[in-house]
Design a protein with these regions (language model features):
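Conserved pre-ATP/AMP-binding loop-to-beta segment of ANL
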Residues: 67, 81-105, 112, 117, ...
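ATP-dependent adenylate-forming carboxylate-activation enzymes
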Residues: 11-29, 41-51, 166-187
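Conserved AMP-binding/adenylation subdomain of ANL enzymes
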Residues: 124-141, 151-191, 200
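A short helix-loop-beta submotif of the ANL/AMP-binding
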Residues: 1-14, 18, 22, 31-36, ...
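Conserved S/T- and glycine-rich ATP-binding loop of Class I adenylate-forming
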Residues: 6, 37, 100, 106-109, ...
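Adenylate-forming
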Residues: 39-53, 146, 189-204
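Conserved AMP-binding
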Residues: 17-19, 136, 146-150
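ANL superfamily adenylate-forming
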Residues: 43-97
Length: 204
């Protein structure tokens, strides 16, 4: 939802790897000049609220923080109700295909994460031509268990489908082999995304 919402208003979406530790999150938030941060409070063993509350006071550019499962997220929805459709159309009409729309960061395994700034044209063309290469149509149902913070899920998955009218099937919040295979069977998927380790886990 936020991928499409930020694109519609011309905000730059900064993808954050949920496996980042506090120091990596701090670096990405500061280096990108992030003004707003939306996060889950926790997932499995990761305590995102604690990480964000440690980082936020140190970042001058960060104007507001919201968590999906508390009143701060409700405040976002309330603020959205104050924006008219006409205002949204005017904002969208002023955008250019060359505008920066997304910053994707590396994993940071060999140092601090490195950010790549991408435009509307960059990511939409990438997704479109992936869909063309795979001959996607409105009849296709694509299972996307790969992460959305990376190009594979966000661009080759979401935008390849969107640009061809194909159905996106999202089996679980993070990769779960059994849930993925169940989704493929139940939704009659025509494509399944993944990397070798994921396919090995699914075959096990």
């Amino acid at each position: 939802i936020f991928q499409y919402a930020t694109a519609k208003i011309g905000a730059i979406l900064v993808n954050v790897n949920p496996a980042y530790r506090t120091h990596e999150l701090e670096y990405v938030v500061a280096q990108s000049g992030m003004r707003a941060l939306l996060s889950a409070t926790s997932y499995k063993t990761s305590q995102y609220r604690a990480m964000v509350e440690t980082v936020a006071p140190k970042i001058a550019s960060l104007e507001w923080v919201a968590f999906f499962d508390d009143e701060s997220y409700d405040a976002i929805l309330a603020a959205a109700a104050e924006v008219s459709e006409e205002q949204l159309r005017e904002r969208s009409a002023g955008l250019s295909a060359a505008d920066a729309i997304n910053i994707q960061y590396t994993s940071g395994t060999t140092g601090f994460p490195k950010g790549a700034t991408l435009s509307h044209r960059n990511i939409l063309n990438n997704g479109f031509f992936v869909g063309e290469m795979l001959h996607y149509t409105q009849a296709d149902r694509v299972c996307i268990p790969v992460p959305f913070y990376h190009c594979f899920g966000m661009v080759m998955g979401n935008l390849a489908c969107t640009s061809h009218g194909s159905t996106m099937v999202i089996p679980a919040p993070t990769f779960e082999p059994a849930a993925t295979m169940e989704a493929v069977a139940q939704e009659r998927c025509t494509s399944l995304y993944g990397v070798p380790t994921m396919f090995i886990a699914e075959l096990s």
